[in-house]
Amino acid sequence: RYGDGGAYRDPNSPYRSWYDFDSKYKGGYRSWWGFETLPEVNEETPSFVEFITGEGGVIDTWLRRGAAGFRLDVADELPDDFIEKIRTAVKRVSPEKFLLGEVWEDATTKFGFDKRRTYLLGKGLDSVMNYPFKNAVLDFVKGKPAEQAMTEILTICEHYPAPAMDTALNFLSTHDTERALTVIADEPANGRGRAWQSGRCVTGDAYEEGLLRLRMAYAIIYTLPGVPCLYYGDEIAMQGYRDSFNRAFFRWDAHEQRLRPVLAQLAQLRHTCEAFRTGQLRVLRAEDGILHYQRVGKVETAEIIVNRTEHIIVETLASGKSTEVNPMGFTIVVEEVGHNPNHSYYDYV
Protein backbone atom coordinates (compact mmCIF):
# COMPACT_ATOMS: atom_id res chain seq x y z
CA ARG A 1 0.00 0.00 0.00
CA TYR A 2 2.77 2.44 0.89
CA GLY A 3 5.73 0.77 -0.82
CA ASP A 4 8.70 -0.88 0.83
CA GLY A 5 10.03 2.18 2.64
CA GLY A 6 8.56 4.70 5.01
CA ALA A 7 7.56 4.59 8.65
CA TYR A 8 4.51 2.40 8.02
CA ARG A 9 6.40 -0.53 6.48
CA ASP A 10 9.88 -0.15 7.94
CA PRO A 11 10.25 -0.53 11.73
CA ASN A 12 13.77 0.89 11.40
CA SER A 13 12.67 4.02 9.56
CA PRO A 14 14.05 7.23 11.13
CA TYR A 15 10.47 8.54 11.00
CA ARG A 16 8.93 5.61 12.86
CA SER A 17 8.96 7.41 16.22
CA TRP A 18 6.97 10.30 14.75
CA TYR A 19 3.83 8.16 14.66
CA ASP A 20 1.86 5.92 16.97
CA PHE A 21 1.48 2.48 15.38
CA ASP A 22 -0.93 0.08 17.03
CA SER A 23 -3.45 -2.45 15.76
CA LYS A 24 -6.15 -0.88 17.92
CA TYR A 25 -6.27 2.06 15.49
CA LYS A 26 -8.07 2.05 12.18
CA GLY A 27 -5.41 1.42 9.56
CA GLY A 28 -2.93 0.46 12.24
CA TYR A 29 -1.89 3.96 13.29
CA ARG A 30 -3.32 6.88 15.24
CA SER A 31 -4.97 9.43 12.97
CA TRP A 32 -6.93 12.64 13.44
CA TRP A 33 -10.52 11.70 14.31
CA GLY A 34 -9.99 8.36 12.59
CA PHE A 35 -9.27 9.81 9.12
CA GLU A 36 -6.58 7.53 7.70
CA THR A 37 -5.33 10.26 5.37
CA LEU A 38 -4.46 12.43 8.38
CA PRO A 39 -1.99 10.46 10.53
CA GLU A 40 -1.21 12.19 13.82
CA VAL A 41 2.37 12.88 14.82
CA ASN A 42 4.02 12.86 18.21
CA GLU A 43 4.88 16.54 18.59
CA GLU A 44 7.32 15.84 21.41
CA THR A 45 9.60 13.57 19.37
CA PRO A 46 12.93 15.48 19.14
CA SER A 47 13.63 14.60 15.50
CA PHE A 48 10.15 15.76 14.46
CA VAL A 49 10.48 19.01 16.43
CA GLU A 50 13.83 19.64 14.77
CA PHE A 51 12.37 18.90 11.32
CA ILE A 52 9.67 21.53 11.87
CA THR A 53 11.41 24.19 13.97
CA GLY A 54 15.15 23.70 13.45
CA GLU A 55 17.39 25.82 11.25
CA GLY A 56 16.73 24.78 7.69
CA GLY A 57 13.50 23.11 8.81
CA VAL A 58 9.97 23.60 7.50
CA ILE A 59 9.29 26.93 9.19
CA ASP A 60 12.73 28.38 8.53
CA THR A 61 12.64 27.36 4.86
CA TRP A 62 9.27 28.84 3.96
CA LEU A 63 9.69 32.06 5.90
CA ARG A 64 13.03 32.70 4.21
CA ARG A 65 11.35 32.09 0.87
CA GLY A 66 8.95 34.95 1.55
CA ALA A 67 6.06 33.65 3.63
CA ALA A 68 4.81 36.28 6.09
CA GLY A 69 3.88 33.79 8.79
CA PHE A 70 1.89 30.70 9.66
CA ARG A 71 -1.62 29.84 10.82
CA LEU A 72 -1.74 26.86 13.16
CA ASP A 73 -4.81 24.80 12.37
CA VAL A 74 -6.55 23.32 15.43
CA ALA A 75 -4.10 24.96 17.83
CA ASP A 76 -6.09 23.40 20.67
CA GLU A 77 -4.58 20.02 19.83
CA LEU A 78 -0.96 21.21 19.87
CA PRO A 79 0.93 21.24 23.18
CA ASP A 80 1.90 24.69 24.46
CA ASP A 81 5.60 23.85 24.50
CA PHE A 82 5.46 22.84 20.82
CA ILE A 83 3.68 26.09 19.93
CA GLU A 84 6.37 28.00 21.83
CA LYS A 85 9.09 26.24 19.83
CA ILE A 86 7.28 27.15 16.63
CA ARG A 87 7.16 30.78 17.76
CA THR A 88 10.90 30.73 18.48
CA ALA A 89 11.53 29.45 14.96
CA VAL A 90 9.26 32.10 13.44
CA LYS A 91 10.81 35.02 15.34
CA ARG A 92 14.32 33.74 14.65
CA VAL A 93 13.78 34.64 11.01
CA SER A 94 12.24 38.04 11.80
CA PRO A 95 10.31 39.62 14.69
CA GLU A 96 7.82 40.81 12.04
CA LYS A 97 6.87 37.28 10.98
CA PHE A 98 3.47 36.31 12.37
CA LEU A 99 2.03 33.27 14.15
CA LEU A 100 -1.77 32.96 14.15
CA GLY A 101 -3.72 30.19 15.83
CA GLU A 102 -7.13 28.67 15.20
CA VAL A 103 -8.86 29.00 18.58
CA TRP A 104 -12.66 29.09 18.70
CA GLU A 105 -13.13 30.45 22.21
CA ASP A 106 -11.61 33.17 24.39
CA ALA A 107 -7.93 32.32 23.98
CA THR A 108 -7.07 33.62 27.46
CA THR A 109 -9.46 31.30 29.31
CA LYS A 110 -9.11 28.20 27.13
CA PHE A 111 -8.41 24.88 28.83
CA GLY A 112 -6.84 21.92 27.06
CA PHE A 113 -4.55 19.03 27.94
CA ASP A 114 -6.01 19.38 31.46
CA LYS A 115 -4.53 22.82 31.97
CA ARG A 116 -5.10 26.43 31.09
CA ARG A 117 -3.56 27.25 27.73
CA THR A 118 -0.81 29.86 27.44
CA TYR A 119 -1.52 31.08 23.91
CA LEU A 120 -1.28 34.83 24.54
CA LEU A 121 1.25 35.07 27.37
CA GLY A 122 4.01 36.26 25.06
CA LYS A 123 5.72 32.94 24.33
CA GLY A 124 3.14 31.35 22.05
CA LEU A 125 0.77 32.75 19.45
CA ASP A 126 0.85 36.35 18.25
CA SER A 127 -2.92 36.27 17.93
CA VAL A 128 -5.91 34.09 17.08
CA MET A 129 -8.95 33.76 14.87
CA ASN A 130 -11.65 35.88 16.52
CA TYR A 131 -14.65 33.56 16.66
CA PRO A 132 -16.12 35.35 19.72
CA PHE A 133 -16.44 38.59 17.67
CA LYS A 134 -18.00 36.66 14.78
CA ASN A 135 -20.62 35.13 17.04
CA ALA A 136 -21.42 38.38 18.83
CA VAL A 137 -21.79 40.40 15.61
CA LEU A 138 -23.93 37.83 13.80
CA ASP A 139 -26.12 37.41 16.88
CA PHE A 140 -26.58 41.18 17.08
CA VAL A 141 -27.67 41.67 13.46
CA LYS A 142 -30.05 38.72 13.90
CA GLY A 143 -31.73 40.35 16.89
CA LYS A 144 -29.66 39.94 20.06
CA PRO A 145 -29.81 43.10 22.24
CA ALA A 146 -26.90 45.43 21.55
CA GLU A 147 -25.88 45.53 25.20
CA GLN A 148 -25.37 41.76 25.29
CA ALA A 149 -23.40 41.68 22.04
CA MET A 150 -21.18 44.56 23.12
CA THR A 151 -20.52 42.92 26.49
CA GLU A 152 -19.18 39.87 24.65
CA ILE A 153 -17.02 42.09 22.45
CA LEU A 154 -15.65 44.10 25.37
CA THR A 155 -14.84 40.92 27.28
CA ILE A 156 -12.45 39.86 24.53
CA CYS A 157 -10.98 43.38 24.29
CA GLU A 158 -10.31 43.41 28.02
CA HIS A 159 -8.87 39.89 28.13
CA TYR A 160 -6.51 40.06 25.15
CA PRO A 161 -3.15 41.89 25.30
CA ALA A 162 -3.19 44.94 23.01
CA PRO A 163 -0.81 43.46 20.39
CA ALA A 164 -2.96 40.33 20.15
CA MET A 165 -6.20 42.33 20.02
CA ASP A 166 -4.92 44.67 17.31
CA THR A 167 -3.94 41.71 15.11
CA ALA A 168 -6.83 39.32 15.84
CA LEU A 169 -8.39 37.91 12.67
CA ASN A 170 -11.97 39.21 12.44
CA PHE A 171 -14.39 37.50 10.05
CA LEU A 172 -18.02 36.46 9.56
CA SER A 173 -17.64 33.33 7.42
CA THR A 174 -15.01 30.59 7.26
CA HIS A 175 -14.44 27.24 5.59
CA ASP A 176 -15.43 25.58 8.88
CA THR A 177 -18.71 27.40 9.51
CA GLU A 178 -21.92 28.27 7.71
CA ARG A 179 -21.68 31.30 5.45
CA ALA A 180 -22.74 34.54 7.11
CA LEU A 181 -25.78 35.14 4.90
CA THR A 182 -27.05 31.62 5.62
CA VAL A 183 -26.65 32.18 9.36
CA ILE A 184 -28.44 35.53 9.15
CA ALA A 185 -31.29 34.77 6.75
CA ASP A 186 -31.90 31.01 6.76
CA GLU A 187 -32.91 28.59 9.49
CA PRO A 188 -30.40 26.52 11.50
CA ALA A 189 -29.59 23.11 10.07
CA ASN A 190 -30.08 21.49 13.48
CA GLY A 191 -28.41 18.29 12.42
CA ARG A 192 -30.32 17.87 9.17
CA GLY A 193 -28.45 16.04 6.45
CA ARG A 194 -26.63 17.03 3.30
CA ALA A 195 -29.66 16.53 1.05
CA TRP A 196 -31.63 19.14 3.01
CA GLN A 197 -28.68 21.52 3.18
CA SER A 198 -27.94 21.25 -0.53
CA GLY A 199 -31.45 22.37 -1.46
CA ARG A 200 -31.52 25.51 0.66
CA CYS A 201 -31.35 28.97 -0.92
CA VAL A 202 -32.79 32.14 0.60
CA THR A 203 -34.69 34.31 -1.90
CA GLY A 204 -37.17 37.16 -2.01
CA ASP A 205 -37.78 39.43 0.98
CA ALA A 206 -35.78 37.20 3.33
CA TYR A 207 -32.77 37.53 1.02
CA GLU A 208 -33.09 41.32 0.71
CA GLU A 209 -33.36 41.77 4.47
CA GLY A 210 -30.49 39.35 5.01
CA LEU A 211 -28.32 41.41 2.69
CA LEU A 212 -28.96 44.54 4.76
CA ARG A 213 -28.10 42.68 7.95
CA LEU A 214 -24.95 41.26 6.37
CA ARG A 215 -23.90 44.76 5.36
CA MET A 216 -24.32 45.98 8.94
CA ALA A 217 -22.34 43.01 10.22
CA TYR A 218 -19.40 43.79 7.97
CA ALA A 219 -19.52 47.46 8.97
CA ILE A 220 -18.99 46.32 12.56
CA ILE A 221 -16.30 43.76 11.71
CA TYR A 222 -14.33 46.33 9.71
CA THR A 223 -14.44 48.95 12.48
CA LEU A 224 -13.77 46.88 15.62
CA PRO A 225 -10.24 46.24 16.94
CA GLY A 226 -8.47 43.56 14.95
CA VAL A 227 -7.81 42.88 11.27
CA PRO A 228 -10.86 42.26 9.05
CA CYS A 229 -10.91 39.22 6.81
CA LEU A 230 -13.39 38.76 3.97
CA TYR A 231 -14.13 35.11 3.17
CA TYR A 232 -14.34 34.66 -0.59
CA GLY A 233 -17.88 34.86 -1.90
CA ASP A 234 -19.33 36.96 0.90
CA GLU A 235 -18.91 40.00 -1.34
CA ILE A 236 -21.45 38.46 -3.74
CA ALA A 237 -23.66 37.10 -0.95
CA MET A 238 -22.91 33.43 -1.48
CA GLN A 239 -24.87 31.03 0.73
CA GLY A 240 -24.09 27.63 2.20
CA TYR A 241 -24.23 25.50 5.30
CA ARG A 242 -21.30 23.39 6.51
CA ASP A 243 -18.64 21.68 4.40
CA SER A 244 -18.85 21.32 1.46
CA PHE A 245 -21.65 23.81 0.88
CA ASN A 246 -19.66 26.66 2.44
CA ARG A 247 -16.72 25.91 0.15
CA ALA A 248 -18.42 26.05 -3.24
CA PHE A 249 -16.57 27.48 -6.22
CA PHE A 250 -16.71 31.25 -6.65
CA ARG A 251 -19.64 32.38 -8.81
CA TRP A 252 -17.87 34.53 -11.37
CA ASP A 253 -21.16 35.17 -13.17
CA ALA A 254 -23.00 36.34 -10.03
CA HIS A 255 -25.48 39.16 -10.57
CA GLU A 256 -25.35 40.24 -6.92
CA GLN A 257 -22.84 43.09 -6.75
CA ARG A 258 -24.38 45.47 -4.22
CA LEU A 259 -22.04 44.60 -1.37
CA ARG A 260 -18.86 45.13 -3.35
CA PRO A 261 -18.70 48.97 -3.24
CA VAL A 262 -19.63 49.01 0.45
CA LEU A 263 -16.92 46.52 1.34
CA ALA A 264 -14.41 48.33 -0.85
CA GLN A 265 -15.11 51.62 0.92
CA LEU A 266 -14.91 49.97 4.34
CA ALA A 267 -11.57 48.43 3.39
CA GLN A 268 -10.26 51.77 2.12
CA LEU A 269 -11.43 53.53 5.27
CA ARG A 270 -9.84 50.86 7.44
CA HIS A 271 -6.60 51.33 5.50
CA THR A 272 -6.48 55.13 5.57
CA CYS A 273 -7.92 55.95 9.01
CA GLU A 274 -5.30 55.54 11.73
CA ALA A 275 -7.94 55.06 14.43
CA PHE A 276 -9.02 51.71 12.98
CA ARG A 277 -5.56 50.18 13.34
CA THR A 278 -4.72 50.78 17.01
CA GLY A 279 -7.40 53.19 18.27
CA GLN A 280 -9.03 52.59 21.63
CA LEU A 281 -12.60 51.26 21.59
CA ARG A 282 -15.08 53.43 23.49
CA VAL A 283 -18.74 52.49 23.67
CA LEU A 284 -21.13 55.45 23.68
CA ARG A 285 -24.38 53.51 23.42
CA ALA A 286 -25.38 49.86 23.20
CA GLU A 287 -29.12 49.58 23.56
CA ASP A 288 -31.65 47.25 21.91
CA GLY A 289 -30.95 47.57 18.17
CA ILE A 290 -28.46 50.43 18.30
CA LEU A 291 -24.67 50.26 18.55
CA HIS A 292 -22.73 53.51 18.86
CA TYR A 293 -19.00 53.42 19.53
CA GLN A 294 -15.74 55.23 18.84
CA ARG A 295 -12.26 54.24 17.80
CA VAL A 296 -9.97 56.87 19.28
CA GLY A 297 -6.52 57.10 17.74
CA LYS A 298 -3.65 59.53 18.20
CA VAL A 299 -4.42 61.45 15.01
CA GLU A 300 -8.04 60.64 14.15
CA THR A 301 -11.25 59.60 15.84
CA ALA A 302 -13.85 57.47 14.10
CA GLU A 303 -17.43 57.23 15.32
CA ILE A 304 -19.62 54.32 14.23
CA ILE A 305 -23.40 54.13 14.59
CA VAL A 306 -25.27 50.99 13.54
CA ASN A 307 -29.07 51.09 13.44
CA ARG A 308 -30.69 47.66 13.36
CA THR A 309 -34.16 49.08 14.02
CA GLU A 310 -36.89 49.64 11.43
CA HIS A 311 -37.01 53.41 11.86
CA ILE A 312 -34.70 56.38 11.41
CA ILE A 313 -32.83 57.36 14.56
CA VAL A 314 -31.25 60.68 15.48
CA GLU A 315 -28.04 60.08 17.41
CA THR A 316 -25.91 62.66 19.19
CA LEU A 317 -22.24 62.45 18.28
CA ALA A 318 -19.43 62.86 20.80
CA SER A 319 -18.89 66.35 19.40
CA GLY A 320 -22.44 67.33 20.37
CA LYS A 321 -23.73 67.42 16.83
CA SER A 322 -26.59 65.19 15.71
CA THR A 323 -26.85 62.82 12.78
CA GLU A 324 -29.59 60.67 11.31
CA VAL A 325 -29.04 56.98 10.72
CA ASN A 326 -31.36 55.09 8.41
CA PRO A 327 -33.13 51.83 9.28
CA MET A 328 -30.91 48.77 8.82
CA GLY A 329 -28.06 51.15 8.05
CA PHE A 330 -24.94 52.62 9.53
CA THR A 331 -22.99 55.86 9.61
CA ILE A 332 -19.26 56.36 10.13
CA VAL A 333 -17.90 59.78 11.05
CA VAL A 334 -14.15 60.51 10.98
CA GLU A 335 -12.46 63.62 12.32
CA GLU A 336 -8.99 64.72 13.34
CA VAL A 337 -8.16 64.70 17.03
CA GLY A 338 -7.92 68.15 18.59
CA HIS A 339 -9.54 69.91 15.66
CA ASN A 340 -13.07 70.74 14.65
CA PRO A 341 -13.08 70.37 10.88
CA ASN A 342 -16.00 69.34 8.79
CA HIS A 343 -16.79 65.74 9.56
CA SER A 344 -16.23 63.06 6.95
CA TYR A 345 -19.44 61.07 6.67
CA TYR A 346 -20.02 57.59 5.34
CA ASP A 347 -23.77 56.92 5.20
CA TYR A 348 -25.49 53.74 4.09
CA VAL A 349 -29.23 53.56 3.56
Where do the protein language model's features map onto the residues?
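Carbohydrate-binding surface patches
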Residues: 258, 284-317
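Amphipathic alpha-helical
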Residues: 263-273, 277
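Substrate-binding/active-site clefts of carbohydrate-active enzymes
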Residues: 1-65, 86, 92, 109
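Aromatic-lined glycan-binding groove of carbohydrate-active enzymes
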Residues: 150-192
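Active-site-proximal helices and loops of the catalytic beta/alpha 8
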Residues: 3, 58, 68-168, 220, ...
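Short acidic/histidine-rich active-site segments
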Residues: 230-236
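C-terminal beta-strand-rich structural cap/linker in extracellular carbohydrate-active enzymes
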Residues: 322-349
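The substrate-binding groove and active-site-proximal loops of carbohydrate-active enzymes
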Residues: 35-50, 67-77, 136-144, 198-209, ...
